[in-house]
Every structure is written in C-alpha cells, then in structure tokens.
C-alpha cells in the first residue's frame, strides 16, 4: 500500500522561479517530498531565470532524502516558453524535462485542435489541457515501470561536486520578515507600522500614509516581494541600498485582473554583507505600500 500526499506551493504571484527558489525550503522541501515536479510558466527565457532555476533544482537535489526531481515545461498561446533556459539546467543536472509545449504546439499548428480547446486564456490549461499534461507525466513514469529491470532503483545522494551552470547564484535562498531579525532588522519603522499578510507572505511592513522605513539586511542578493493592488491607492516607492538609488517600484495595478504579490531583485553582489536599505513612498496621491517580505540569498 502506498500513501500519497500532494505538497503544493502555488500562489497568486508572478516572477515564478525567482520567488520559488526563496520559498522552496520553507513551503515545499520541509515536507521532504519524494518526487518534485517544477513548473514555472511566468519565467522569461533568459539568463536571470536560468540562474533561478539552477539554484532551485540544485537545492531540491541536495535534500537529505534524495528526491526525484523533474521539470515540467508549459507554454503560452503564442508558443513562448522559458524552455531553452530551463533545458540548460535540466541537462547540467541530468534530470528529466517533460515538455507540454512540445506536445501541444505541433498539434495546434497541424490543425488537430486549437489553443481554445485546451485553455480558457492565453496561459492556463483547462481540464483537457491538464489531461494532456497528466498523460505526459504518466507516460514518463509508465516507461520507467515498463523497464524497471534495467533501471537503477537505488536513490543516490547528489554529487555536490557537480558544477552549477550559472554558479548557484541564489544558494541558501530564504524569506525575510519581521520574524527573521538575524537577516532583516528594522532600524526605523517610520510610518510602516502595519503588519502585512497576503497568502503565505506574512509579517511584512505596510503604510497607508506614505513615509519611509529603514532596514539592515545581511545578504549577497536582495529582492522585495510587494503587494500590487487594483484599488488605485498603492503608489510608487524608491529604494536605496547603502545610500545609493537602486530601484523604483510601482505597486499600482489599477484596473488589473486582481491583487497579487510581485517580486523584484533590487541588489546583487558576490559576497554576503550587511547593508542599509531604505524604502520611501514618493507618490503623495497614492500613499499605500506593502513590503510583504524580503528575498534573501
């Protein structure tokens, strides 16, 4: 008898694997999954997201319970996909990549069905789309089962000498909040007195009156998860690191499809150090701003 438990880490977020590599340990890997399927359609097909996927896959492979790891590659209606960037990572670590993109796009081009048959929009599969996706996974597993006598069934520890294709930029990635003062310390809360929560992003900092908040953050790379809202009240914040202007972040999503958490990398370097970080709302007409969490690596 086999007991199966599904551990899901999906949320109403964007910039997928960038947030995913920071959330993975807390929201997925602590459950010690035996099989990990990684899927991120919101990634771009570029070096940044290749580096995010590199660190995420490596983090999964390094787990003590030696899980099986694979990448599932989706598609948009226009055929765009981060597949090329993700494939480089899959090949570097010799893990399977199953391509929904390669399965459906040739069939659509051949006229066997339309995109509308498998999706209600330009990205997300409907029930029929998910049936195709599931069939690709079951076919892959079934092929292993059919050839089980020739398969090495021993779970081996990951060889840590394996070269990371992009240098494991986001090694030890984690989430910073009010509860992690060892890496994120609020030095001057200012007007950001609200304790924010959105889905699993808890213990953040928010203001409804504009103003400034200051931190000391110990990291090599720093990113911000902030709250995009459709109510027209969230505005623009300027971010400084060690006194230097590094980012302007606009949390206004007026007339958009809904509120969501968005991430942006604001600082990167080669060494871990403690930095002063200052966030100031600069739009007096739209004084709301929520820092849901910090992305630390």
Please provide the spans of the model-predicted regions:
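Short coil/turn motif common to extracellular beta-sandwich-like domains
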Residues: 217-221
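Extended, polar beta-sheet/loop recognition surfaces of beta-rich domains
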Residues: 285-297
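Solvent-exposed, flexible loop/coil residues
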Residues: 6, 122, 127, 174, ...
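Alpha-helical cap/lid subdomain in secreted, periplasmic
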Residues: 19-150, 205-208, 216, 227-238, ...
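Single conserved hydrophobic/aromatic residue that forms the stacking wall/gate
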Residues: 2-8, 13
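Glycan-recognition and processing domains
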Residues: 146-216, 227
């Amino acid at each position: 008898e086999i007991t199966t438990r599904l551990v899901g880490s999906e949320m109403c977020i964007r910039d997928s694997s960038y947030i995913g590599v920071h959330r993975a340990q807390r929201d997925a890997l602590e459950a010690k999954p035996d099989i990990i399927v990684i899927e991120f359609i919101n990634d771009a097909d570029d070096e940044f997201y290749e580096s995010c996927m590199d660190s995420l896959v490596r983090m999964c492979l390094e787990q003590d319970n030696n899980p099986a790891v694979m990448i599932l590659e989706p598609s948009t209606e226009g055929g765009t996909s981060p597949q090329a960037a993700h494939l480089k990572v899959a090949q570097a670590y010799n893990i399977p990549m199953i391509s929904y993109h390669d399965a459906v796009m040739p069939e659509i081009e051949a006229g066997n069905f339309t995109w509308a048959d498998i999706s209600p929009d330009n990205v997300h599969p409907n029930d029929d789309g998910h049936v195709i996706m599931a069939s690709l996974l079951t076919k892959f597993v079934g092929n292993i089962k059919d050839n089980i006598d020739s398969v090495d069934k021993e779970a081996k520890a990951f060889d840590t000498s394996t070269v990371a294709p992009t240098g494991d930029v986001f090694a030890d990635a984690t989430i910073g909040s009010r509860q992690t003062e060892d890496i994120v310390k609020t030095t001057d809360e200012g007007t950001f007195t609200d304790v924010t929560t959105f889905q699993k992003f808890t213990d953040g900092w928010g203001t409804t009156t504009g103003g400034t908040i200051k931190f000391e953050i110990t990291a090599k790379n720093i990113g911000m998860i902030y709250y995009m809202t459709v109510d027209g009240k969230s505005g623009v914040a300027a971010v400084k690191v060690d006194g230097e202007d590094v980012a302007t972040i606009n949390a206004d999503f007026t007339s958009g499809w809904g509120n969501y958490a968005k991430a942006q990398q604001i600082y990167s370097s080669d060494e871990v150090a403690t930095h002063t970080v200052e966030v100031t709302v600069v739009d007096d007409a739209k004084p709301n701003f929520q820092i849901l969490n910090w992305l630390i690596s």
